[in-house]
């Protein structure tokens, strides 16, 4: 008898976005190593496939939780392999070192400039392993998150 392994799809991405429209605030929850997708190099079960959209001027709170056995981090950067936060305060403390397994850190920043950024793990080699999502700051609109594979 052959045994078939079936991959469990990740949860819907909207589960990881909380919006407070009257106060112009969003909370993005990034769970590092949510599951085995991409050998655990993922946020929320996705590797490079989520696109978060936030209107310019809004306050963004990022909750970075590490569920994996390796150290992981979260930061907002511009461009591939950048280690400099794109906005003041847009990284966990010591993002190149990362969080130990089971730890959580938070940071808050103001989405002051339009553009396309990356929510990335800055531990050495992890961004190259596709442990990042897209963050788009737009002039107007509503906060959202989409699975780019579903487009």
Predicted regions: what they are:
Residues 1-3:
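Sec-dependent N-terminal signal peptides
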Residues 5-6, 11, 22-24, 95-151:
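Extracellular/periplasmic metallocenter environments
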Residues 9-18, 37:
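Conserved functional micro-motifs across diverse proteins
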Residues 15-19, 48-76, 104-113, 117:
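Beta-strand cores of secreted/periplasmic/IMS beta-sandwich domains, seen most often
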Residues 23-59:
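N-terminal edge beta-strand
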Residues 29, 51, 61, 118-120, ...:
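Ordered hydrophobic segments in well-structured contexts
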Residues 32-34, 58, 64-68, 76-80, ...:
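A mature extracytoplasmic/lumenal domain signature
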Residues 67-101, 127-134:
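Histidine- and aromatic-enriched segments that form or immediately flank copper-ligand environments
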């Amino acid at each position: 008898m052959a045994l078939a392994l079936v991959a469990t799809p990740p949860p819907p991405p909207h589960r990881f976005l909380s919006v407070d429209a009257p106060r112009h605030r969003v909370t993005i929850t990034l769970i590092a190593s949510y599951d085995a997708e991409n050998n655990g190099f993922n946020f929320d079960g996705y590797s490079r496939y989520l696109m978060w959209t936030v209107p310019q001027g809004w306050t963004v709170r990022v909750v970075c939780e590490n569920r994996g056995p390796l150290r992981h981090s979260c930061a907002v950067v511009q461009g591939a392999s950048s280690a400099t936060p794109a906005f003041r305060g847009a990284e966990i403390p010591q993002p190149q070192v990362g969080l130990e397994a089971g730890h959580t850190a938070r940071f808050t920043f103001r989405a002051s400039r339009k553009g396309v950024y990356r929510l990335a793990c800055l531990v050495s080699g992890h961004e190259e392993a596709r442990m990042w999502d897209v963050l788009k700051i737009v002039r107007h609109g509503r906060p959202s998150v989409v699975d780019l594979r579903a487009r």
